[in-house]
A protein has these predicted regions:
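Catalytic center-proximal scaffold of phosphoryl-transfer enzymes
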Residues: 1-180
């Protein structure tokens, strides 16, 4: 098996350990989808906070996202640290700031723990390389929700779900036509 493998994960310890156990020399990446989910939540929190003269929260969060997109984890963590300390001074003034402050702190730890798995997503995207599992998750959600509509009264069997995943994997690997 001399096939290159790229693992995309949400950054959880268990998943990462499993990847390293299964195939240590493979490429291990943090899924961009999971980064943007967290960034989007922080932006929504920032929208609910009254503007201050001290810092433009949304602009700072955008900077963090930009640095991560370009694989500059060091600068992303610096900006995140600055944002964390700026918010720390405002925590007493507004409960919404406290929520964002905690989210930024959690995000800071998440990025620091997964820094070794953050590539230059912009370059990977430019060269047509996979950066996210969002398209797979979206497809699976569509198929499952279609199947679970009450009018159709269909339920998944273990065999049916397994067969669906085999077909989907073949389609994604451009192997589907070879089956026939």
């Amino acid at each position: 098996m001399n096939q290159d493998i790229t693992f995309l994960s949400d950054g959880g310890d268990t998943v990462r350990d499993l990847q390293l156990y299964l195939r240590p020399p493979a490429e291990h990446l943090l899924d961009w989808f999971h980064i943007t989910m967290r960034v989007t939540v922080m932006k929504q929190m920032a929208n609910g906070i009254p503007r201050t003269d001290l810092v433009d929260l949304e602009a700072e969060i955008d900077r963090v996202e930009w640095y991560l997109w370009h694989g500059n984890v060091f600068r992303a963590l610096q900006v995140t640290d600055d944002l964390y300390f700026d918010l720390e001074g405002l925590v007493v003034a507004c409960p919404a700031v406290t929520k964002l402050w905690k989210a930024v702190d959690e995000f800071r730890g998440y990025i620091a723990n997964n820094s070794a798995f953050i590539p230059n997503y912009g370059d990977r995207y430019l060269y047509g390389e996979v950066i996210s599992t969002a398209f797979v998750e979206s497809t699976i959600n569509q198929v499952i929700s279609k199947r679970m509509v009450k009018k159709q009264q269909m339920r998944w069997t273990k065999r049916g779900a397994h067969l669906l995943l085999q077909v989907r994997t073949q389609v994604l690997n451009d192997e589907w036509r070879d089956t026939f």
